[in-house]
Regions:
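Extreme N-terminal leader/targeting segments of oxidoreductases
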Residues: 1-7, 25-26, 30-31
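Short hydrophobic core segments
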Residues: 7-10, 35, 185, 204-206
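Glycine-rich Rossmann-fold phosphate-binding loop(s) that bind the pyrophosphate
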Residues: 11-17, 37
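Gly/Ala-rich phosphate-binding loop of Rossmann-like dinucleotide-binding domains
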Residues: 20, 24, 171-173
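Short beta-strand "acidic-cap" motif of Rossmann-like dinucleotide-binding folds
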Residues: 30-36, 132
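Dinucleotide-binding Rossmann-like beta1-alpha1 core, especially the glycine-rich loop
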Residues: 54-137
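Helical element adjacent to the flavin cofactor pocket in flavoenzyme catalytic cores
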Residues: 114, 121-126, 148-206
């Protein structure tokens, strides 16, 4: 059949689910439809290691090397994003085993210590709240005699990604989002002043 919506979101992975939720949070009056070709969170969003990091530059050294002038802003944006994830999980009671675990980048050889210390000095100078841990403190967190030291990044968590997806879907529906699983988008075409999204079994007009 044919239905209408103010906003159509394609894909019920984490990006699509969060887009739909944020749209309804900001504009509750919007009629939002979310189309998913399979099941909610069945692909990469629900089948990953569950690491939730504030870094949006694939690590501090990489970000500083590529975008030195913008890194502090990028780091602040990443931290704000992590806080937003945590707030959404807490505010809506999403049961997804989220833990602010932190992350350790460890040294297993003495010569690696200087590199880790340089990492910390450089990252902190650009706004990242990381710490160098000596061998004793590192082994207190992870009982292995191999570890000579570590960089500790507190802005990292871990989550059950599938349960996060299912929880976000529940929140989206509670906010009024209409979710259609097994409805892969086949085409996107202009339609009057809006757009038309077609699936195998119907069409959504905006």
């Amino acid at each position: 059949g044919v239905t209408t919506a103010d906003l159509v979101v394609v894909g019920a992975g984490l990006s699509g689910l969060w887009t739909a939720v944020r749209a309804k949070q900001r504009r509750p009056e919007l009629d939002v439809v979310l189309l998913e070709g399979g099941r909610i969170g069945q692909s990469a969003s629900g089948r990953n290691g569950g690491f939730v990091a504030a870094s949006i530059t694939h690590g501090h050294p990489n970000g500083i090397e590529r975008w030195p002038a913008e890194f502090a802003t990028l780091q602040a944006m990443g931290v704000e994003n992590l806080r937003g994830i945590e707030k959404t999980i807490a505010d809506y009671g999403i049961d997804c085993d989220y833990q602010r675990s932190g992350e350790l980048q460890v040294a297993t050889e003495p010569y690696q210590i200087a590199h880790l210390q340089e990492h910390v000095e450089l990252a902190r100078a650009h706004g990242a709240e990381v710490e160098f841990w000596d061998a004793e403190r590192t082994r207190g967190a992870v009982a292995s005699p191999l570890y000579q030291g570590a960089v500790h990044d507190p802005e990292v968590g871990i989550v059950d990604p599938a349960r996060l997806c299912w929880g976000l879907a529940r929140v989206a529906e509670e906010l009024g989002v209409r979710i259609h699983e097994h409805s892969p988008a086949q085409s996107l075409q202009p339609s009057g002043a809006g757009m038309s999204v077609s699936t195998y079994s119907g069409r959504v007009e905006t």
